[in-house]
């Protein structure tokens, strides 16, 4: 490109080394930093050019993009600069700007000085191209999320200003409608702030700011705690006042010293009304085996062991510990009647078996069946 041609303001088609084509209006050319700035840029993708990473075209129009000169493959002028209805060359005019923001970017196409009245690309954040109204009308809030940095020569994407200034504007707009602590709007004339042209995507954000200002902070913290808790944790916990507290370890020696076995045996016999039927003899102790117990035949059982001797291997295999169960022993007829009253009439009866015989037959009935199966398997009979 020759230096005599006024390319500023013309429509440029630029192809990067990543084979992505961009179209935009030439804004500035920085020879010191070797950068080219385009305004109103649109990406057309790779367009079937050979590349390892193909990119589809995008419909978004970016406010400006600054390209690195070393990463530009080809530049083509598509359209000459549009004729602008500028003011006559009056030496009294130092600088002028039109009412609309887009027309201010084409003031640089004055033939006598293309760079007069035009700020450099480093001052674009304060220029009319990045004004709040123009950025809101194009919806530039969503541009930082566009993955344009796949191309290595894109140095800087569209910026909408620092976040702190935007947050201050939102807070000021939220404070524009004063509200009492009780939630009642104040009556009378109120000064309304100047309306901001905010895109629809930013409208819910302002609504949440107003809601947060109206809610007390304690209520929000309480709601936040209740979300993380389950229903059972919200209920007040009751502490038992009559909890048993143990001061030290249990002393077994002291407990054994207080434990008298003979006195407990006497109390136990008195409660059960034990009767001693055997006569006492001279020089012999009174036996404890005179408890009347009846079996199924009605004959009393005698204790084969001596007094206070609960198990003697030489006399009998059985012990004398379960004497309480002997006094409460019932016949098979009584137990069958009790089972019928409790569980009802069963579908299968034990034919001709007493309680003890039926019990042994129930447990031992599987043994002859296994023996019969073994004999059949051994003899080969089916």
UniProtKB/Swiss-Prot annotation:
Ranges for domain DFDF: 238-274
Protein name: Protein LSM14 homolog B
Motif (FDF): 300-302
Biased composition (Low complexity): 166-177
Upper classification of the organism: Eukaryota, Metazoa, Chordata, Craniata, Vertebrata
Cited PROSITE patterns: DFDF, FFD, SM, TFG
Region span, Disordered: 164-243, 270-310, 354-382
GO molecular-function terms, A-Z: RNA binding
GO BP annotations, alphabetical order: regulation of translation
Pfam families (alphabetical): FDF, LSM14
Ribonucleoprotein as UniProt keyword: yes
């Amino acid at each position: 490109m020759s230096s005599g041609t006024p390319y500023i303001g013309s429509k440029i088609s630029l192809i990067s080394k990543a084979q992505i084509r961009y179209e935009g209006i030439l804004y500035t050319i920085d020879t010191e930093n070797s950068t080219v700035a385009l305004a109103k840029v649109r990406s057309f993708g790779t367009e079937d050019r050979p590349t390892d990473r193909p990119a589809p075209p995008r419909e978004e129009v970016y406010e400006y993009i600054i390209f690195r000169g070393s990463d530009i493959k080809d530049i083509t002028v598509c359209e000459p600069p549009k004729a602008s209805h500028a003011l006559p060359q009056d030496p009294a005019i130092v600088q002028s700007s039109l009412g609309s923001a887009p027309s201010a970017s084409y003031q640089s196409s004055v033939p006598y000085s293309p760079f007069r009245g035009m700020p450099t690309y480093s001052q674009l954040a304060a220029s009319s191209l990045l004004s709040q109204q123009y950025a809101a009308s194009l919806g530039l809030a969503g541009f930082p999320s566009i993955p344009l940095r796949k191309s290595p020569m894109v140095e800087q994407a569209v910026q909408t200003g620092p976040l702190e200034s935007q947050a201050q504007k939102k807070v000021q707009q939220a404070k524009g409608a004063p509200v009492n602590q009780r939630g009642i709007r104040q009556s009378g004339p109120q000064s309304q702030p100047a309306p901001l042209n905010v895109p629809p995507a930013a409208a819910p954000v302002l609504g949440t700011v107003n809601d947060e200002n109206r809610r007390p902070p304690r209520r929000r913290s309480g709601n936040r705690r209740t979300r993380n808790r389950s229903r059972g944790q919200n209920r007040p916990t009751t502490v038992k006042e009559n909890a048993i507290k143990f001061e030290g370890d249990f002393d077994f020696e002291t407990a054994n010293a207080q434990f008298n076995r003979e006195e407990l045996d006497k109390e136990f016999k008195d409660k059960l009304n034990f009767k001693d039927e055997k006569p006492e003899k001279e020089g012999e102790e009174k036996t404890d085996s005179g408890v009347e117990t009846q079996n199924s035949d009605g004959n009393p059982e005698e204790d084969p062991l001596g007094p206070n001797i609960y198990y003697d291997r030489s006399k009998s295999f059985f012990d004398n510990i379960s004497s309480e169960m002997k006094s409460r022993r019932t016949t098979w007829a009584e137990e069958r009647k009790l089972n019928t009253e409790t569980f009802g009439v069963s579908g299968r009866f034990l034919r001709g078996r007493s309680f003890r015989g039926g019990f042994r037959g129930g447990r031992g009935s599987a043994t002859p069946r296994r023996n019969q199966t073994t004999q059949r398997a051994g003899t080969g009979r089916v």
